[in-house]
C-alpha cells in the first residue's frame, strides 16, 4: 500500500528551520536549496533570509514570504519536492471549480475527505482490478455527491495514484466543468462502444495524474449501466488506473445509481446533515446489501 499524503498547504511550522541550506537534515534536502534549484529563489535572497533567521529565528519559508521573495504557493511546491510527494500546482488549483477549491481549503471538509480517502485505501482500493472501481452515491440531489467524488479523487491522486473520474450523471453531470474538461472530449457512451479509447484519456491536471470521462446529454441511463458494455469498460479502465470513481445521479431519481454500484461492487455514500433522509439512507443500505455491493463508508457534510 502506498503511503498516504495530506493536502500540502502553506504552514510556517512545516518549513525547514535549518540555518545551512546546503546540508541535508535527516536525509532531506534543505527547503532553501530546493527553492534555489527550482529557480524560485536567488542565492543572494537565500542568504538574506538566512541572515534574518540567524538573528531573529523563524522558519525559512515564512521569512522568504514575508520578505516578498516568494508566494505561499511556491513554498508549497518546494515542501512537496522536499518530501517527494505529488502536489497540486498553483496553475492547476486555479483551474478547479470554486466549490472544489473551497472544499479542499476548508479544514473541516478536508478532514472528512481525507478520512474517506484513508478508509478507501485501507478497505477497498488495492492491486486487484475488481477492487479499483467505486460508485459515489447519495439519496437525493444537492447532497455533496459530486463534490465528494471530486475531492476524494483529487486526494487519492495526491498519493501518487492514477485516478479516473467517471461522470454517469447524463445531462446534469458537473465533473467536466469542475475540472475544466472540454465538452468535445470523449464521452462515456463512446468509451462503452470502444473501451480502448478510454485508455488514451489524458490527465486534466499538469501536476497530478487525474483524468475525467463524462456522460454527455441524455445518453447514459440505468439500462446502459447494467449492460455488459459498461461492465467491459470498467474492467478495461480498472486494469489501467489505480482508482476509478464513478459519480452517479441521486439514488431517489432513478435506478442508475444502483446499477452503477452493482457494477462497481463498492460504494461510498455522501450524506448532507439536515438534508439527507434517514429512510432514504436506510433503503440504500438494504439495496446495496441485496445487490452484493460493499458499503465502504459515508462522508458526512454540512453546507
Model-identified regions with their sequence ranges:
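Non-catalytic accessory regions
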Residues: 1-96
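Phosphate-binding loop that captures ATP/GTP phosphates
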Residues: 155-216, 234
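Helical mechanochemical/support elements of P-loop NTPase systems and associated helical scaffolds
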Residues: 27-31, 45, 56, 60, ...
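Extended, non-globular alpha-helical segments
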Residues: 94-128, 182-184, 189-192, 196-206, ...
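Walker A/P-loop phosphate-binding motif and the immediately C-terminal alpha-helix
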Residues: 105-181
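C-terminal lobe/tail of nucleotide-utilizing enzymes
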Residues: 2-9, 87-116, 282-303
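Conserved catalytic-core segment of NTP-binding enzymes
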Residues: 189, 224-303
Amino acid at each position: 500500500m502506498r503511503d498516504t499524503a495530506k493536502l500540502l498547504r502553506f504552514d510556517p511550522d512545516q518549513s525547514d528551520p535549518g540555518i545551512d541550506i546546503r546540508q541535508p537534515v535527516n536525509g532531506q534536502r534543505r527547503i532553501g536549496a530546493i527553492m534555489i534549484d527550482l529557480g524560485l529563489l536567488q542565492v543572494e535572497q537565500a542568504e538574506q533570509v538566512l541572515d534574518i533567521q540567524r538573528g531573529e529565528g523563524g522558519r525559512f519559508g515564512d521569512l522568504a514570504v514575508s520578505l516578498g521573495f516568494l508566494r505561499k504557493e511556491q513554498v508549497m511546491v518546494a515542501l512537496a519536492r522536499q518530501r517527494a510527494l505529488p502536489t497540486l500546482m498553483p496553475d492547476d488549483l486555479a483551474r478547479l471549480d470554486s466549490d472544489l477549491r473551497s472544499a479542499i481549503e476548508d479544514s473541516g471538509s478536508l478532514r472528512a475527505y481525507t478520512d474517506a480517502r484513508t478508509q478507501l485505501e485501507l478497505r477497498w482500493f488495492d492491486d486487484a482490478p475488481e477492487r479499483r472501481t467505486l460508485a459515489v452515491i447519495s439519496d437525493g440531489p444537492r447532497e455533496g455527491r459530486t463534490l465528494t467524488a471530486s475531492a476524494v479523487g483529487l486526494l487519492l491522486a495526491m498519493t501518487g495514484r492514477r485516478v479516473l473520474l467517471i461522470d454517469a450523471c447524463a445531462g446534469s453531470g458537473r465533473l467536466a466543468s469542475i475540472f475544466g474538461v472540454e465538452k468535445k472530449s470523449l464521452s462515456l457512451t463512446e468509451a462503452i462502444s470502444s473501451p480502448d479509447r478510454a485508455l488514451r484519456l489524458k490527465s486534466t491536471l499538469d501536476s497530478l495524474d487525474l483524468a475525467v470521462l463524462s456522460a454527455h446529454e441524455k445518453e447514459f441511463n440505468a439500462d446502459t449501466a447494467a449492460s455488459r458494455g459498461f461492465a467491459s469498460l470498467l474492467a478495461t479502465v480498472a486494469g489501467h488506473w489505480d482508482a476509478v470513481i464513478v459519480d452517479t445521479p441521486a439514488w431517489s431519481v432513478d435506478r442508475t445509481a444502483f446499477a452503477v454500484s452493482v457494477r462497481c461492487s463498492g460504494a461510498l455514500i455522501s450524506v448532507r446533515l439536515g438534508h439527507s433522509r434517514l429512510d432514504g439512507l436506510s433503503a440504500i443500505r438494504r439495496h446495496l446489501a441485496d445487490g452484493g455491493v460493499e458499503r465502504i463508508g459515508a462522508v458526512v457534510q454540512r453546507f
